[in-house]
């Protein structure tokens, strides 16, 4: 790639969105992804079966090669190694930045992840920006209009192809209608006053979709997707002031246990619900007790049993994995996930300076820098001649801000450092002090300004509790 012999082609905005998902929210999203995909579950009928969209995810470090060519418009055509490719931009569909592409000389249409042999997520349970179901359906329809008449084979990112024009068109039409149906029916009920949980409880997939395997909820789930549609238009809040500022789980758990007359009463009620097969109610009861007292082994064990039953009954692999991961962690504790900073390096090296500073900003411990301010000029000699060579990084009102292409003559300090070396520091391969003393970093002015910023950066939790406090 660096030698120019290979292009990395991506939709406009791809790198920005990758950074947002994998770095700014990376630690939290990565921890939650263990629940969505279940890679730490033992394989087998009582453990991990698959991920719904594919068999499994790898547990190695993440890497990223930045795109060398952005696609910016539908109808844009490139010839890659002698093969013509026509692109369709599909932003805010399965991902914020996405595209389909067509090989006109072969009649082959790739729908990326906009179509799969399963219902997809409108928002993954690991967390992400909520997807636009309406726009998603419209872009599938646009693909039918643009490419449908000339498509002889259709394939997607994860699953097997569809052969023949008629089969491909039928597949696209049903996928289009699935996302539009979820969107329209959710909002129909929302506009009658139903809240997200009520809508999820009442909507059922009609036979039109149940008759075909590729519109079943093996990955995404109607329960979760209807809530995603509601969230996109109406937020997490259901409009009831009782839910506007609810107590956190530990506080509400203790109050429910007290109201019930103690842990034994909660456990007794939970067992009755469990034996009756009322697993969702049983899980809610035991959740209050586990958060009120995570040392209560009887409560943890019963909640694990409940989660397992909920998992075994789930068609969606992500629901199953989440329930079974919760059960496993209630019995054995959550895993040691140390080394996260190093695993992020593969993505950091592809980031712009602005994106690097944005990732630093979300680590600033605001409570520690009250009343402090700082201005630091940055020069990156390995980016000489580019718009990223000079930067200003400032601390103001417990917040970091950055400005490209500017130095401030009143800055507290000016630092010259290679971008690659800054990444080494951020991933804890070395320190500012060591590199300054060895002459690899030069700093003029008040070096404590640098310490004011970088000495008050938080370290993201390598792992954190989910099913307990």
Which residues make up each language-model segment?
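Feature captures hydrophobic
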Residues: 269, 278-284, 291, 295, ...
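Alpha-helical segment of the N-proximal tetratricopeptide repeat
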Residues: 252-285
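Active-site HxH/HxHxD metal-binding segment of metal-dependent hydrolases
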Residues: 1-67, 71-73
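Active-site neighborhood of phospho(di)ester-bond hydrolases with catalytic His/Asp-centered motifs
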Residues: 1, 9-12, 90, 109-112, ...
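Catalytic core of the metallo-beta-lactamase
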Residues: 51, 56-121, 126-134
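Divalent-metal (often Zn2+) His-rich catalytic cores of metallo-beta-lactamase-fold enzymes
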Residues: 118, 134-239, 302, 306-309
């Amino acid at each position: 790639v660096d030698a120019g012999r290979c292009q990395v082609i991506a939709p406009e905005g791809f790198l920005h969105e990758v950074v947002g998902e994998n770095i700014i929210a990376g630690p939290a999203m990565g921890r939650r992804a263990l629940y969505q995909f279940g890679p730490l579950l033992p394989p087998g009928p009582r453990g991990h079966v698959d991920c719904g969209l594919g068999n499994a995810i790898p547990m190695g470090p993440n890497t990223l090669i930045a795109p060398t060519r952005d696609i910016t418009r539908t109808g844009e055509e490139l010839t890659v190694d002698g093969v013509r490719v026509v692109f369709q931009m599909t932003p805010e569909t399965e991902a914020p930045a996405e595209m389909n592409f067509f090989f006109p000389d072969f009649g082959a249409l790739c729908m990326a992840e906009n179509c799969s042999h399963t219902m997809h997520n409108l928002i993954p349970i690991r967390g992400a920006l909520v997807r636009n179901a309406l726009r998603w359906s419209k872009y599938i329809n646009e693909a039918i209009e643009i490419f449908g008449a000339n498509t002889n084979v259709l394939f997607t990112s994860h699953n097997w192809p569809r052969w023949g024009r008629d089969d491909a068109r039928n597949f696209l039409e049903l996928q289009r209608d699935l996302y539009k149906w979820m969107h329209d029916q959710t909002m129909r009920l929302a506009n009658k006053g139903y809240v997200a949980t009520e809508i999820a409880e009442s909507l059922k997939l009609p036979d039109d979709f149940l008759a075909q395997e590729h519109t079943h909820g093996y990955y995404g789930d109607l329960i979760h997707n209807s809530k995603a549609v509601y969230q996109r238009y109406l937020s997490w809040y259901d409009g009831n002031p009782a839910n506007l500022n609810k107590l956190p789980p530990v506080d509400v758990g203790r109050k429910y246990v007290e109201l019930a007359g103690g842990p034994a009463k909660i456990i007794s009620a939970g067992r009755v619900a469990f034996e009756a097969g009322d697993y969702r109610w049983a899980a809610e009861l035991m959740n209050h007790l586990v958060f009120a007292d995570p040392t209560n082994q009887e409560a943890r064990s019963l909640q694990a049993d409940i989660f397992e039953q909920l998992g075994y009954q789930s068609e969606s692999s992500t629901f199953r994995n989440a329930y079974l991961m919760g059960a496993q962690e209630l019995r054995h504790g959550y895993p040691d996930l140390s080394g996260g900073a190093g695993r992020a390096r593969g993505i950091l090296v592809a980031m712009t300076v602005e994106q690097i500073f944005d990732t630093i900003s979300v680590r600033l411990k605001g409570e520690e820098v009250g009343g402090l301010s700082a201005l630091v000029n940055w020069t990156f000699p390995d980016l000489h001649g580019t718009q990223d060579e000079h930067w200003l990084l400032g601390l103001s009102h417990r917040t970091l801000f950055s400005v490209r292409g500017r130095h401030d003559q009143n800055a507290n300090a000016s630092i010259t450092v290679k971008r690659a070396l800054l990444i080494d520091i951020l991933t804890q391969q070395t320190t500012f002090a060591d590199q300054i003393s060895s002459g690899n970093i030069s700093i003029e002015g008040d070096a404590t300004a640098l310490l004011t910023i970088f000495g008050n950066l938080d370290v993201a939790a390598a792992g954190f509790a989910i099913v307990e406090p």
